[in-house]
């Protein structure tokens, strides 16, 4: 995580939060969870017990603001990325519009239901619908409108949902950045 601090820095800056990527960072391990095959690819795929603890209003607001900052960063990268991205070493990889379609599709059809929302997938270029979907997701994270969702009912608690949704947008923003430049 510390090695990626500079890459994460635009997110808290966008959210209006203090963050110094140059500071000496010390991590305290507060919980260990078993990973899955997804973990090898960086997916935060396991809900830690700590995420099930009650969420205070101030923390919910902070998390929702960080998720919105992730979306803003994603949208900026999309706006600056070429339609056709450099292919991977085996010639694979989605181009920009397919990545956008994947991200907004996951938010609407995979992530939103996990926090109690029913959203249909918007077209990748329907900015009005995407904005409305994201506003609904952020509102659910802020207000706890999704209730006390747990892994047992296939739901996600707010902390995990915010981390997963934000990670997904940032991960694909970085993919587009990395593949926008010639090797």
Language-model features: where?
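Short, contiguous alpha-helical
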Residues: 1-18, 64, 68, 72-131, ...
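Short, charged, surface-exposed hinge/linker loops at domain edges
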Residues: 6-57
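Short hydrophobic/aromatic-rich motifs at helix boundaries and adjacent loops
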Residues: 43-48, 81-83, 111, 144
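Short secondary-structure boundary micro-motifs
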Residues: 48-50, 60-62, 148-149
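A short small-residue
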Residues: 50-54, 118, 151
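A short, mixed-charge helix-start or loop-turn motif at secondary-structure junctions
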Residues: 56-60, 154-155
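Transmembrane alpha-helical segments of integral membrane proteins
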Residues: 139-148
